[in-house]
């Protein structure tokens, strides 16, 4: 496909989220989010991708999945459940001549374990050992705040990571709150903090760290990066006067690396509580 034909093909797709460099001066027309992505890349630099198996959750157009391959990953599995992004991903994979990145479609972040079991069974056969169904790195990027149950997703991510594997997470964060809080954005269209119908929760930094620790992760604090990423904010006309204090929060973005740990790395009471499946249904303890 020549450059002009490729540009026509790209522009025929109704929506692009990522700006993916396809070579020969062609970049997909994604959103202007370079400060956000570059902040994430600086945190990602702390992870060695060479020879690793990588899971990219909710990959969308696949930018960070393809970048993982470029960084030396031996295999990348990209998952998503948005139909409109599937064609974009497959086109980019074709143009980039990607051989190590696979798209596994119709995978919710809430059922990674079950859906990936199908993937591994179909792709590798049923005799595959349990430990091989896990990943060295899980990329959980721009996702946490979109989820009604964010901790369930973190537990699912931990369940498919090897011990000492790395979780790369990027999310909205409250920049100016030192207490552990998880701010509720309100029912869709209320937009207390973010004028985005898909945003449910925004954690403070300490809350994010505690959520990760409660999902069997150790925070690599030296990798943490944050900045005030300005997004269009909704006027507070729909918020009552008693809720005006909500404006005090500065919403930004952060990225951090966390390492997968075992129950034995926690104190006894915490390990006992976290391991109860009826309390923590997202964590599949038989895989740990």
Tell where the protein language model's regions lie, with residue ranges.
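Short N-terminal micro-motifs specific to bacterial/archaeal maturation
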Residues: 27, 45, 129, 141-144, ...
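Short, electropositive, low-hydrophobicity segments enriched in small/polar residues
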Residues: 62, 66, 146, 169
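Conserved sugar-transfer catalytic core signal across GT-A, GT-B, and GT-C glycosyltransferases
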Residues: 64, 143, 153
């Amino acid at each position: 496909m020549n450059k002009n034909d490729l540009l026509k093909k790209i522009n025929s797709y109704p929506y692009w989220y990522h700006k993916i460099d396809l070579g020969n001066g062609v970049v997909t027309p994604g959103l202007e989010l370079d400060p956000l992505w570059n902040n994430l890349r600086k945190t990602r630099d702390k992870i060695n991708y060479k020879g690793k198996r990588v899971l990219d959750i909710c990959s969308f157009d696949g930018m960070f999945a393809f970048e993982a391959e470029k960084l030396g990953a031996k295999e990348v599995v990209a998952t998503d459940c948005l139909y409109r992004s599937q064609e974009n991903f497959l086109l980019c994979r074709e143009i980039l001549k990607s051989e190590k990145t696979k798209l596994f479609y119709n995978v919710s972040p809430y059922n990674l374990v079950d859906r990936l079991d199908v993937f591994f069974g179909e792709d590798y056969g049923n005799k595959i050992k349990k430990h091989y169904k896990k990943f060295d790195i899980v990329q959980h990027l721009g996702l946490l705040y979109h989820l009604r149950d964010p901790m369930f997703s973190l537990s699912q991510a931990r369940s498919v990571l090897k011990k000492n594997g790395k979780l790369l997470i990027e999310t909205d964060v409250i920049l100016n709150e030192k207490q552990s809080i998880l701010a509720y954005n309100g029912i869709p269209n209320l937009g207390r903090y973010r004028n985005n119908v898909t945003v449910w929760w925004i954690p403070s930094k300490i809350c994010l760290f505690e959520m990760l620790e409660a999902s069997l992760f150790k925070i690599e604090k030296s990798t943490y990066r944050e900045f005030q990423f300005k997004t269009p904010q909704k006027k507070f006309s729909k918020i009552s006067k008693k809720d005006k204090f909500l404006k005090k929060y500065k919403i930004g973005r952060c990225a951090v690396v966390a390492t997968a740990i075992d129950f034995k790395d926690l104190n006894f009471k915490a390990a006992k509580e976290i391991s109860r499946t009826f309390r923590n249904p997202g964590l599949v303890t038989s895989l740990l």
